[in-house]
Curated annotation (Swiss-Prot):
The keyword Nucleotide-binding does not apply. This is Heat-inducible transcription repressor HrcA. It comes from Enterococcus faecalis (strain ATCC 700802 / V583). Negative regulator of class I heat shock genes (grpE-dnaK-dnaJ and groELS operons). Prevents heat-shock induction of these operons. One of its GO terms (molecular function) is DNA binding.
Amino acid sequence: MITERQQNILRLIIQNYTNTGLPVGSKKLMEDGIASSSATIRNDMKALEEYGLLAKTHSSSGRIPSMAGYRYYVDHLLQPTQVEENELRRIRQSFGKEFHEINDIIRQSAEILSELTSYTAFSLGPEVKERKLTGFRMVPLNDRQVLAIIVTDKGNVENQVFAIPAAVSSQDLEKMTQIINDKLVGQPLLTVYHRLRTEIPMILHRYFQTPEGMMNLFDEMLGHAFEEKVFVGGRMNLLDFGIKQDIEQLKSVYSFMQNSDELTHLLNGSATTENPIVFRIGSEIGNNLLEDMSMITATYEVSGHGKGTIALLGPTSMPYSKIFGLVDTFRHELASQLGDYYRFLGN
């Protein structure tokens, strides 16, 4: 059973260590308000070490937090710090510019959060399942390439260049555009996804000599509308903490950061409506590459448009109270900005 004094000692050690990166000794704790003798404080520190909440370094008689110590602090002792006025002003100014689509706002949010913390930030917009397909066009670029433009009612515009199979003619592409506009435009994306697996293959068999090639093209083009895009800010900040200077590990982390599916999996399933802000520390992140780091994940909700996620990946020695307060404020500011944008669109 941890005593109230031991809790205070643990709290002060973590706050000092996250500020300075230096082990904390009994003298510093006395200066910070622990009203006990040096011997009593050392005994409490030893007890906390035996509980697995503190660790001793070889170079100092002071202590540093363990992973379990950070977890105990986050669960029982953390008190969020209010965001400073200049940081709040900076957030609002960054969101104050003109945006042309929702993804611009989501992308900007990752950049802002990364700049505010010097950590790696992630931002995932409101769920894809809430959207409808509202527009589809194909613009020929040359004989073998076409630009596909996909629009949804949530202000998202996807465009990408696709290679056209040799067996597919320009007449086939015109017919394909007509089918998409007749059968799919105006439908929720979940309905579009279902029809791509059921009704559309039968239609393609009716109209095309090579339905497999057309089906692959359908899948490739419309698949982009279903992707949950994770925007990352400050990728290179990972090199400043947590990553051992091992070239193979650096390659693995870089590859991981380019994998949208992996990043989506990393962000999903942690924060909930009941617990909208969640810290995962070390091995709790569930990825061996990130076991020396901490991650804070937060959900935000835009009324009528679903939920999104923001996250920060940083060192285990991050200032948890400050980061919690910042992320909590940021998620509300982002939700407000997205809500304003949707109202501007009339959605």
